[in-house]
């Protein structure tokens, strides 16, 4: 387990970030990685299943609303129930909420525009395994690209998420201050990413796979590899499980 995780990346019709994630896990981290067509029904012995970004089924009806009925999703639910890792990025986060693997919903951005930018995120609940590799770091910077990334949940669900420390990423400024101005899409409580109560399923709107290689950074800085550390966190968590 300490040599790497066995990764499966689900490909839905309309996915467009699957190969970006595969580049990180297969080429940079040297982890065994397979692309899995959405009609698969057996996830075998994968440690990590990733639902990548994109526009699954053209975002018809609602983002992720059709993808949740794909045959592979029953296996993803079983994988999660077994305590194994599941990561949903952007459209993958939307699919996880539609499939009820995570609470709440992702709705239209506050200004109704598609947003493509880099944002600062304050790390919350650092005891969670997904954040183990970040050490003393409290603020990271990741790209976002979405039109329906506004996180919404009812008051009771929000209170439970906060009380259970299921919020892992919160939109903030460069100093880690959570403000209305640092919220790009109107998400309640500035929420950018949450996990399930057990902690093995994570959904996030920012794209960690786009901040994992110095060669792809337009301005190398302390935040260049902020996304890579998310994946490295799982290896650390698995090695010491």
Swiss-Prot record:
Domain Glutamine amidotransferase type-1 as annotated: residue spans: 6-241
EC number of the protein: 6.3.5.3, 3.5.1.2
Gene Ontology CC entries for this record: cytoplasm
InterPro entries named in the record: Class_I_gatase-like, PRibForGlyAmidine_synth_PurQ
Signal peptide start-end: none
BP GO terms, sorted: 'de novo' IMP biosynthetic process
Recorded metabolic or biological pathway in which this protein acts: Purine metabolism; IMP biosynthesis via de novo pathway; 5-amino-1-(5-phospho-D-ribosyl)imidazole from N(2)-formyl-N(1)-(5-phospho-D-ribosyl)glycinamide: step 1/2
Catalytic residues (UniProt): 90, 207, 209
Pfam family, one: GATase_5
Cellular compartments annotated: Cytoplasm
Keyword entries, A-Z: ATP-binding, Cytoplasm, Glutamine amidotransferase, Hydrolase, Ligase, Nucleotide-binding, Purine biosynthesis
UniProt keyword Secreted present: no
Matches recorded under NCBIfam families: FGAM_synth_I (TIGR01737), PRK03619.1 (NF002957)
Oligomer status and interactors: Part of the FGAM synthase complex composed of 1 PurL, 1 PurQ and 2 PurS subunits.
Stated name of the protein: Phosphoribosylformylglycinamidine synthase subunit PurQ
Species for this entry: Thermosynechococcus vestitus (strain NIES-2133 / IAM M-273 / BP-1)
């Amino acid at each position: 387990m300490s040599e790497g995780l066995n990764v499966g990346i689900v490909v839905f019709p309309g996915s467009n970030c699957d190969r970006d994630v595969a580049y990180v896990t297969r080429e940079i981290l040297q982890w065994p990685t397979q692309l899995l067509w959405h009609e698969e029904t057996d996830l075998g012995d994968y440690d990590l299943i990733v639902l990548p970004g994109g526009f699954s089924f053209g975002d018809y009806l609602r983002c992720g609303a059709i993808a949740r009925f794909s045959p592979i999703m029953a296996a993803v639910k079983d994988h999660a129930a077994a305590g194994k890792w599941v990561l949903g990025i952007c459209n993958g986060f939307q699919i996880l909420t539609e499939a009820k693997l995570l609470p709440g919903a992702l709705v239209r951005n506050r200004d109704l525009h598609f947003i493509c930018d880099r944002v600062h995120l304050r790390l919350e609940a650092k005891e969670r395994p997904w954040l183990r590799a970040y050490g003393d770091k409290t603020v990271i910077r990741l790209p976002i690209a979405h039109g329906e990334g506004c996180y919404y949940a009812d008051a009771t669900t929000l209170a439970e998420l906060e009380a259970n420390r299921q919020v892992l990423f919160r939109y903030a400024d460069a100093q880690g201050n959570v403000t209305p101005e640092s919220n790009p899409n109107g998400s309640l409580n500035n929420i950018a990413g949450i996990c399930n109560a057990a902690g093995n399923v994570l959904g996030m709107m920012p794209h960690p796979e786009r901040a994992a290689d110095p060669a792809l950074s337009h301005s190398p800085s302390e935040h260049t590899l902020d996304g890579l550390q998310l994946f490295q966190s799982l290896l650390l968590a698995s090695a010491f499980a």
